[in-house]
């Protein structure tokens, strides 16, 4: 609706959630959110899990949670165990739940429902969810199940564009699609727990990042931090910094 113009998106967001910067259209939020409780997380220590995955560039088996942990977790060099980083606030346990109430105008009902449906399908909310951490599941609001997350889904098609066109923008803005349909990854089987899903996600990510054409061929010396193909997927990469980026 907005031609993927981030300025128009920001203005629309400002009118919906309130703003003090739209010169002739500053307003209060049309949406109100209320949580049933604001309890702090209760998990202050990390239960050791098996070192259940292998990485072709690492000499020893590793813990999938540590591999995907990017920040909350670290490896204690003395005990060789996965632990929370120092001074980290207690985290929310995987099995915890809360009640979210949303009050909104009738005119924003469709947009709110679509947003909730996408959150439910993909289990994620923006940058707060990464590598499976921060994942969540919504119940209620007449949300469709995973069986509707398929190539023929009209709502997903509305939010998709051809893969090559997507590269014209330098920010994530749409689902990609090719001649075969939507480019959405799904695991071959469901998992009973978050930890089981994290093992599968770690294996997939390692396999994807270590494909032959993404093996480091330029950035081999830590003293000469040059950009390589794998950096196009994500940054930082452990032991493979890029000059000018290393300290950022």
Task: List where the protein language model places each region.
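Basic, Gly/Ser/Thr-rich N-terminal segments that form RNA-phosphate-binding interfaces in CRISPR RAMP
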Residues: 1-248
């Amino acid at each position: 609706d907005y031609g993927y113009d981030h300025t128009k998106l920001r203005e629309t967001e400002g009118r919906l959630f309130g703003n003090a910067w739209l010169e002739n259209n500053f307003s209060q939020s049309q949406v109100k959110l209320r949580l049933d409780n604001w309890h702090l997380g209760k998990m202050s220590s990390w239960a050791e899990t098996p070192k259940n995955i292998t990485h072709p560039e690492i000499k020893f088996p590793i813990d999938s949670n540590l591999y995907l942990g990017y920040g909350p977790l670290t490896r204690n060099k003395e005990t060789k165990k996965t632990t929370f980083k120092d001074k980290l606030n207690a985290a929310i346990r995987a099995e915890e739940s809360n009640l979210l109430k949303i009050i909104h105008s009738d005119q924003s009902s469709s947009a709110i429902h679509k947003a909730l449906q996408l959150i439910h399908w993909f289990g994620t909310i923006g940058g707060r969810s990464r590598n499976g951490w921060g994942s969540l599941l919504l119940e209620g609001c007449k949300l469709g199940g995973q069986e509707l997350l398929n190539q023929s889904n009209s709502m997903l098609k509305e939010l998709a564009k051809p893969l090559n066109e997507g590269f014209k923008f330098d920010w994530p803005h749409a689902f990609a699609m090719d001649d075969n349909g939507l480019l959405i990854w799904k695991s071959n089987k469901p998992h009973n727990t978050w930890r089981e899903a994290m093992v599968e996600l770690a294996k997939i990510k390692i396999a994807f990042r270590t494909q032959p054409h993404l093996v480091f061929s330029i950035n081999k010396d830590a003293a000469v931090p040059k950009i390589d193909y794998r950096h196009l997927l994500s940054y930082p990469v452990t032991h493979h910094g890029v000059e000018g980026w290393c300290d950022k």
